[in-house]
Amino acid sequence: MADSISDLQKDTFYWQRLLRLAGYYHGAIDGIPGNGTRNGTERWSTDADRYKMETGCFDERTERNISTLLPEAQKAARQWFKLARNEAVNQGYEAKIICGTRTYAEQNDLYRQRPKVTNARGGQSWHNFGLAWDFGIFQ
Protein backbone atom coordinates (compact mmCIF):
# COMPACT_ATOMS: atom_id res chain seq x y z
CA MET A 1 0.00 0.00 0.00
CA ALA A 2 1.27 3.46 -0.86
CA ASP A 3 2.31 5.84 1.92
CA SER A 4 0.60 8.81 0.33
CA ILE A 5 -2.62 9.38 -1.50
CA SER A 6 -2.74 10.22 -5.19
CA ASP A 7 -3.20 13.72 -6.54
CA LEU A 8 -6.66 12.66 -7.77
CA GLN A 9 -7.62 11.64 -4.24
CA LYS A 10 -6.26 14.90 -2.81
CA ASP A 11 -8.23 16.89 -5.37
CA THR A 12 -11.36 14.84 -4.67
CA PHE A 13 -10.99 15.31 -0.89
CA TYR A 14 -10.69 19.05 -1.44
CA TRP A 15 -13.66 19.15 -3.84
CA GLN A 16 -15.84 17.07 -1.50
CA ARG A 17 -15.07 19.50 1.33
CA LEU A 18 -16.08 22.48 -0.83
CA LEU A 19 -19.24 20.71 -1.99
CA ARG A 20 -20.14 19.94 1.63
CA LEU A 21 -19.48 23.53 2.68
CA ALA A 22 -21.84 24.69 -0.09
CA GLY A 23 -24.49 22.17 1.02
CA TYR A 24 -24.27 20.07 -2.16
CA TYR A 25 -22.61 16.93 -0.77
CA HIS A 26 -23.61 14.82 2.21
CA GLY A 27 -21.55 11.67 1.69
CA ALA A 28 -18.26 10.63 3.24
CA ILE A 29 -15.28 12.86 2.54
CA ASP A 30 -13.19 9.95 1.34
CA GLY A 31 -11.41 11.16 -1.79
CA ILE A 32 -13.36 8.72 -3.95
CA PRO A 33 -15.39 10.32 -6.76
CA GLY A 34 -18.82 8.73 -6.80
CA ASN A 35 -22.46 9.54 -7.49
CA GLY A 36 -22.73 11.92 -4.54
CA THR A 37 -19.71 13.89 -5.72
CA ARG A 38 -21.04 13.99 -9.30
CA ASN A 39 -24.53 15.05 -8.19
CA GLY A 40 -23.09 17.77 -5.95
CA THR A 41 -20.93 19.00 -8.81
CA GLU A 42 -23.98 19.20 -11.10
CA ARG A 43 -25.93 21.22 -8.51
CA TRP A 44 -22.91 23.52 -8.05
CA SER A 45 -22.70 24.08 -11.82
CA THR A 46 -26.43 24.71 -12.17
CA ASP A 47 -26.39 27.42 -9.50
CA ALA A 48 -23.17 28.95 -10.85
CA ASP A 49 -24.64 29.12 -14.36
CA ARG A 50 -27.78 30.79 -13.02
CA TYR A 51 -25.73 33.48 -11.26
CA LYS A 52 -23.68 34.04 -14.42
CA MET A 53 -26.88 34.57 -16.43
CA GLU A 54 -28.07 37.15 -13.88
CA THR A 55 -24.94 39.32 -14.17
CA GLY A 56 -23.54 38.48 -17.59
CA CYS A 57 -20.06 37.24 -18.42
CA PHE A 58 -16.80 38.98 -17.62
CA ASP A 59 -13.28 38.58 -19.01
CA GLU A 60 -11.74 35.09 -19.12
CA ARG A 61 -9.45 35.53 -16.09
CA THR A 62 -12.25 36.91 -13.92
CA GLU A 63 -14.61 34.12 -14.98
CA ARG A 64 -11.99 31.45 -14.26
CA ASN A 65 -11.42 32.81 -10.75
CA ILE A 66 -15.09 33.37 -9.95
CA SER A 67 -15.82 29.77 -10.96
CA THR A 68 -13.61 28.51 -8.10
CA LEU A 69 -15.76 30.16 -5.43
CA LEU A 70 -18.71 28.63 -3.60
CA PRO A 71 -21.87 29.39 -5.58
CA GLU A 72 -23.22 31.90 -3.04
CA ALA A 73 -19.82 33.62 -3.03
CA GLN A 74 -19.90 33.57 -6.85
CA LYS A 75 -23.19 35.45 -6.70
CA ALA A 76 -21.74 38.06 -4.32
CA ALA A 77 -18.50 38.36 -6.32
CA ARG A 78 -20.43 38.85 -9.56
CA GLN A 79 -22.68 41.53 -8.09
CA TRP A 80 -19.74 43.34 -6.49
CA PHE A 81 -17.48 43.00 -9.54
CA LYS A 82 -20.10 44.36 -11.92
CA LEU A 83 -20.18 47.59 -9.90
CA ALA A 84 -16.40 47.73 -9.34
CA ARG A 85 -15.62 47.07 -13.00
CA ASN A 86 -18.03 49.77 -14.17
CA GLU A 87 -16.46 52.29 -11.77
CA ALA A 88 -12.95 51.35 -12.92
CA VAL A 89 -13.93 51.71 -16.58
CA ASN A 90 -15.53 55.10 -15.88
CA GLN A 91 -12.16 56.26 -14.52
CA GLY A 92 -10.14 54.84 -17.42
CA TYR A 93 -8.99 51.61 -15.80
CA GLU A 94 -9.62 47.91 -16.18
CA ALA A 95 -10.57 45.63 -13.27
CA LYS A 96 -10.19 41.86 -13.01
CA ILE A 97 -10.69 39.26 -10.32
CA ILE A 98 -7.19 37.83 -10.13
CA CYS A 99 -7.66 35.06 -7.55
CA GLY A 100 -10.46 32.99 -6.09
CA THR A 101 -10.22 29.77 -4.12
CA ARG A 102 -6.71 28.68 -3.14
CA THR A 103 -5.51 25.31 -1.89
CA TYR A 104 -3.72 25.13 1.45
CA ALA A 105 -0.45 24.60 -0.44
CA GLU A 106 -1.03 27.72 -2.57
CA GLN A 107 -1.88 29.70 0.57
CA ASN A 108 1.27 28.49 2.34
CA ASP A 109 3.36 29.47 -0.71
CA LEU A 110 1.94 33.00 -0.49
CA TYR A 111 2.53 33.08 3.27
CA ARG A 112 6.24 32.32 2.76
CA GLN A 113 6.72 35.00 0.06
CA ARG A 114 8.80 38.06 0.70
CA PRO A 115 7.84 40.79 0.86
CA LYS A 116 4.95 39.55 2.98
CA VAL A 117 1.71 39.34 1.01
CA THR A 118 -0.57 37.62 3.56
CA ASN A 119 -0.82 36.91 7.28
CA ALA A 120 -2.84 33.73 6.72
CA ARG A 121 -1.37 30.24 6.45
CA GLY A 122 -3.15 27.40 4.68
CA GLY A 123 -6.47 26.75 6.42
CA GLN A 124 -6.59 30.27 7.90
CA SER A 125 -7.72 32.17 4.80
CA TRP A 126 -11.24 32.63 3.49
CA HIS A 127 -9.71 31.82 0.10
CA ASN A 128 -9.21 28.21 1.26
CA PHE A 129 -12.96 27.83 1.66
CA GLY A 130 -14.16 29.45 -1.57
CA LEU A 131 -15.36 32.60 0.18
CA ALA A 132 -12.85 35.28 -0.86
CA TRP A 133 -11.47 36.79 -4.03
CA ASP A 134 -8.71 39.24 -4.90
CA PHE A 135 -9.02 41.86 -7.59
CA GLY A 136 -6.66 44.09 -9.47
CA ILE A 137 -7.01 47.46 -11.14
CA PHE A 138 -4.98 47.87 -14.34
CA GLN A 139 -4.28 50.71 -16.79
Give short role names for the model-derived ranges.
Residues 1-2, 139:
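Charged, low-complexity surface segments at secondary-structure and domain boundaries
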Residues 3-62:
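Short acidic, glycine/serine/threonine-rich helix-capping segments at coil-helix boundaries
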